[in-house]
Amino acid sequence: MRWVIMKKLGKIWNYLSKPEIVPRIFSVFLALVFIFGLLMPHYLNPNQLYPKPIPHSQTLKTPLAPYDRGGIPLKEPAELKAQYPQYEPNLGKITAYLTPIAEWIKDKTYYFGTTIVSTPGGILDEILYYTRGMDTVLESSILLISFIIFSWLFFNKD
């Protein structure tokens, strides 16, 4: 009985190890994850250190939208929740910085926050804020796809 199970398991592993099968299984898995993700209710989590305004509520009100956390650096602190109470006196004094070029762009347009120059990691921060760990899945997916492409190129080098 034990050998029968091991033999069947070996056949399954051998089938799954074929380079032409892996992308199919992976794409089915991704499709199921995305379908499940679309069916889940989505909402902003209010329990954040940087409270977020309702999406699009900052549009045409501040050039830093949607990245404006409030406050004026070193003058008026932003409204934040303390993760470490010992840092409460300095909390929210600096939530962002702008280079001179970024300051100039901010003064010229209301759409500065949606440009690539707005903050070095701003776009990635927003993606990570809304996805909560999806970056790990994305990075793993990119790595797996690169190995699939490499193995296909390696086995089909003729």
From Swiss-Prot:
Keyword field? Cell membrane, Membrane, Transmembrane, Transmembrane helix
The lineage's top-level taxon is Archaea
InterPro entries assigned: Prd_NiFe_hyd_3_EhaF (IPR011313)
An example of a Pfam family matching this protein is DUF2106
Presence of the UniProt keyword Metal-binding in the record: no
What does the record say about its membrane topology? Multi-pass membrane protein
State what protein this is by name. Uncharacterized protein MJ0524
Species annotation: Methanocaldococcus jannaschii (strain ATCC 43067 / DSM 2661 / JAL-1 / JCM 10045 / NBRC 100440)
